[in-house]
């Protein structure tokens, strides 16, 4: 076999991307940071990106989804009821997206979350609520994206369909495709999936006139990324990226939770590890303590009535110092050092060449998780809001794609090598890691047996020399090869990575011209039919939410009318007893309707309207009679 390079230089990729971006997108484009713990949405407001506030008035939204009966809760409402509904409240689901159930990280997560993680029919990791209904991680992500979409639509005053959605730089192909699927389920046209550190670099560098070499240290709720970028003349070129897709704030929370549970076990002899509600309370307390220790030297964890035994109610009360927290989480910080060093090596730069380190992600607020020191000894700069930079950068890119922002060229890279296997389970990288994208490369393969008429191709992603030690992303067969002696047929295999980092593979028999094409979605992933069904489910949820919201509005109006009528009954002096009795009857009827949980919205609205009209008529009588009485006195 031999290889032939088709494309791959930064200049070629930039040219490809520039041509692609010359086709401007129609309509507003929102930028969404779909985070592990919090999500954020931004859009272009004039020539600047702007973060949008959600319906609760906050600029970030918890990436939490809960199901309570027939009700779906998203964001803050879902997070607030997590303690009382742990089995049906899903958080940090981004850590599951695009992963197989057998993944070692998934097996660890199963032990650490109060909800169930189950094996789907396709082998992926899904979640299951307390009623036994299963959801894919993409579906849960879609519910959060719907909230982001709604937030943008409330600000813009019209429907939104286009989005740039971010993902960790070290996400593999399956995770990127699953992220894009989440957008599709949410009713969004995801025009670009962009790496989070790259988006943050856009937010940081758009107004910079000086050429610079920067490192973006992104430690978020569930993932860690480190990227080195060169910014020069409107070109943002990623030199290298590295990271850990299972390292983030959730791991710090878990480490502190484990410490609290162990200390409680030592003093009380009680193991809380099997009590879901208690675990959720401890987890929330650990998260709160972690945040407080970013500015305080010490904090207190106080959880009264955490459980009970023969001696009565038991409480957790302990003080935790910042130094103790740093000791508990030191091993997690150390896990970020190796990716930083490898990224610098892959980029071919030395520490002294880095001009700035940009800190991104909420965890960079924590002193022990501030990061950057291993990349830039002089210390990092805090030039952007770590919670908002990624969404702002995504919105900026959306503005460029729409033609509403300054032109720029973004040259990103693929984080992991993509290739196939040959005889002996040897991995042949066709597109090496940190290759600039979009990119297309080809290799020529041949048969190993005389008369062989078909070749099975397995696509792997990773850095191990043994193919089976890497992650398999998909497989396909090319059949119909004319029989010939081994080594004679020539099959050209082409790997094409688009601007979203998603790979498409084509195998072509050069003798017959026969081809086989696939888009890599791993062995699992969502089928087109599953995505369409999830879109229908989402639309049904949206309809149910609309009906419920309208019923709540009608109930609120009914309650207001009841309060008004009951107050007026005690104040009327000139209204006849018969009219008062009529109002009392209508009040009783409306109150009875309010007590019926199955009352139809229209019936409740009609009863409310009837009472309102009667009260208004009595009010008119009261006013006229009072005016006449006052006139007679004059």
UniProtKB/Swiss-Prot annotation:
Stretch forming the transit peptide? 1-20
Question: What InterPro entries does the record tag this protein with?
Answer: ATPase_NBD, Chaperone_DnaK, Heat_shock_70_CS, HSP70_C_sf, HSP70_peptide-bd_sf, Hsp_70_fam
Compartments annotated for it: namely: Mitochondrion
GO CC annotation, single: mitochondrion
Q: Which Pfam families match?
A: HSP70
Coiled coil regions in record: 538-614
For whether the record's keyword set contains ATP-binding, the answer is yes
Q: Signal sequence span per UniProt?
A: none
- Entry similarity comment: Belongs to the heat shock protein 70 family.
State what protein this is by name.
Heat shock 70-related protein 1, mitochondrial
């Amino acid at each position: 076999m031999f290889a032939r390079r088709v494309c791959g230089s930064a200049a070629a990729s930039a040219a490809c991307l520039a041509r692609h971006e010359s086709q401007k997108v129609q309509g507003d484009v929102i930028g969404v940071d779909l985070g592990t713990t919090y999500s954020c949405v931004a859009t272009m407001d004039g020539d600047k990106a702007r973060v949008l506030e959600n319906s609760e008035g906050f600029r970030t939204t918890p990436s939490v989804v809960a199901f309570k009966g027939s009700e779906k809760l998203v964001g803050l409402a879902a997070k607030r009821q997590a303690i009382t509904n742990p089995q049906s409240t899903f958080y940090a689901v981004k850590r599951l997206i695009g992963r197989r159930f057998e993944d070692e990280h998934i097996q660890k997560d199963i032990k650490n979350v109060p909800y169930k993680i189950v094996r789907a029919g396709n082998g992926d990791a899904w979640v299951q609520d307390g009623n036994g209904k299963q959801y894919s991680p993409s579906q849960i992500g879609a519910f959060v994206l719907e909230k982001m979409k709604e937030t943008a639509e409330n600000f813009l005053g019209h429907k939104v369909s286009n989005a740039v959605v971010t993902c960790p730089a070290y996400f593999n192909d399956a995770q990127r495709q699953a992220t894009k699927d989440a957008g599709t389920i949410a009713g969004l046209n995801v025009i670009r999936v962009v790496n989070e550190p790259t988006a943050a670099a856009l937010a940081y560098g758009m107004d910079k006139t000086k050429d610079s070499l920067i490192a973006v240290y992104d430690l978020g709720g569930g993932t860690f990324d480190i990227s080195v970028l060169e910014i020069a003349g409107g070109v943002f070129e990623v030199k290298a990226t590295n990271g850990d897709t299972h390292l983030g704030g959730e791991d710090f929370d878990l480490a502190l939770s484990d410490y609290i549970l162990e200390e409680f076990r030592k003093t009380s002899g009680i193991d809380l590890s099997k009590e879901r509600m208690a675990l959720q309370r401890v987890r929330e307390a650990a998260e709160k303590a972690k945040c407080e220790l970013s500015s305080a030297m010490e904090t207190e964890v106080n959880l009264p009535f955490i459980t009970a035994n023969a001696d009565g109610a038991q409480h957790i009360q302990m003080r935790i110092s910042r130094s103790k927290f740093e000791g508990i989480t030191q091993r997690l910080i150390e896990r970020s050092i190796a990716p930083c060093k490898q990224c610098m090596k892959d980029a071919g730069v030395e520490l002294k060449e880095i001009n700035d380190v940009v800190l991104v992600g909420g965890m960079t607020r924590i002193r022990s998780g501030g990061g950057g020191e291993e990349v830039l000894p002089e210390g990092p700069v805090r030039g952007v809001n770590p919670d908002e930079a990624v969404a702002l950068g995504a919105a900026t890119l959306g503005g460029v794609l729409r033609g509403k922002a300054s032109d720029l060229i973004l040259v990103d890279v693929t984080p992991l090598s993509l290739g196939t296997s040959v005889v002996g389970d040897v991995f042949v990288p066709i597109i090496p890691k940190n290759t600039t994208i979009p990119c297309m490369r080809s290799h020529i393969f041949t048969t190993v047996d005389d008369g062989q008429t078909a070749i099975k191709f397995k696509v792997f992603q990773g850095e191990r020399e043994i193919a089976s030690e890497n992650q398999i992303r998909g497989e396909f067969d090319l059949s119909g090869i004319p029989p010939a002696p081994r080594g004679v047929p020539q099959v050209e295999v082409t790997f094409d990575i688009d601007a979203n980092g998603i790979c498409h593979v084509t195998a072509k028999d050069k003798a017959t011209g026969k081809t086989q094409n696939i888009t890599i979605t791993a062995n699992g992933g969502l089928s087109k039919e599953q995505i369409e069904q999830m879109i229908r489910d989402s639309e049904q949820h949206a309809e149910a939410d609309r009906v419920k919201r309208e019923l709540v509005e009608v109930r609120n109006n009914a309650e207001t009318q009841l309060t008004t009528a009951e107050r007026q009954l005690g104040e009327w002096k000139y209204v006849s007893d018969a009219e008062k009795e009529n109002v009392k009857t209508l009040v009783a009827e409306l109150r009875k309707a309010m007590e019926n949980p199955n009352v139809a919205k229209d019936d409740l609205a009609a009863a409310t309207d009837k009472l309102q009209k009667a009260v208004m008529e009595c009010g008119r009588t009261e006013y006229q009679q009072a005016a006449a009485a006052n006139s007679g006195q004059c």
